Amino acid sequence: MEVKVLDFNGKDTGRKVQLSDSVFAIEPNNHAVYLDVKQYLANQRQGTHKAKERAEVTGSTRKIKKQKGTGTARAGSVKNPLFKGGGTVFGPRPRSYSFKLNKNLKRLARKSAFSIKAKESNIIVLEDFNFEAPNTKNFINVLKALGLENKKSLFVLGESNKNVYLSSRNLKASNVVTSSELSTYAILNTNNLVLLEGSLELIEENLSK
């Protein structure tokens, strides 16, 4: 598929780029997307939740009443899970939620995400640009020129650009990443995907392996 290239003033440069059909025009595999997003979110979890079990609760181990003759259920300790302040039965324990996915499935998921965005016409190809120094106002002007002000957008760079990154860091609705940092979750969690020309070759090279 062909997409026109815009400059950072939002004007047509008169050039077009050919996006690879094997990356931007496949039939999306929803299950692969689901697994990759699930893995990404699972990896964000700290897994430090912890509840005290019966053996870990502070309290006396003295038997609180005699075994028989009270007419009520037997009870051995105030740490019994049935009592207020007692231990928790099968409570959460520290654990890792991360799990592995093979590379082919992750590539398929990213290609599916790109294809979904392309089908929705939510991909913009932008000429590579740079700022002389970090300047949020300059980045806002780029957003205005592209009609993306106050809209959720993700800018994908070919390589790290400190000035562009710092210029966008204070904007809640816009994020800047490099092609190597791009995830399925990030692609789908934005309304508009802005691909700088320098990132296209790297994306297609990485996902065509």
From Swiss-Prot:
Q: Extract one GO BP annotation from the record.
A: translation
> Which UniProt keywords are listed?
Ribonucleoprotein, Ribosomal protein, RNA-binding, rRNA-binding
> Does the record carry Translocase as a key word?
no
Q: List S-S links within the chain.
A: none
Output the Gene Ontology terms for molecular function. Answer: rRNA binding; structural constituent of ribosome
| Record Pfam families | Ribosomal_L4 (PF00573)
**GO cellular component entries:** ribonucleoprotein complex; ribosome
InterPro entries the UniProt entry points to: Ribosomal_uL4, Ribosomal_uL4-like, Ribosomal_uL4_dom_sf
Cite the SUPFAM superfamilies for this sequence: Ribosomal protein L4
Q: Where is this region: Disordered?
A: 45-77
Q: What does this protein do?
A: One of the primary rRNA binding proteins, this protein initially binds near the 5'-end of the 23S rRNA. It is important during the early stages of 50S assembly. It makes multiple contacts with different domains of the 23S rRNA in the assembled 50S subunit and ribosome.
On subunit structure and binding partners, the annotation says:
Part of the 50S ribosomal subunit.
The Swiss-Prot or TrEMBL record describes its family as follows: Belongs to the universal ribosomal protein uL4 family.
Q: What is this protein called?
A: Large ribosomal subunit protein uL4
Q: Which organism is it from?
A: Flavobacterium johnsoniae (strain ATCC 17061 / DSM 2064 / JCM 8514 / BCRC 14874 / CCUG 350202 / NBRC 14942 / NCIMB 11054 / UW101)
Gene, per the UniProt record? rplD
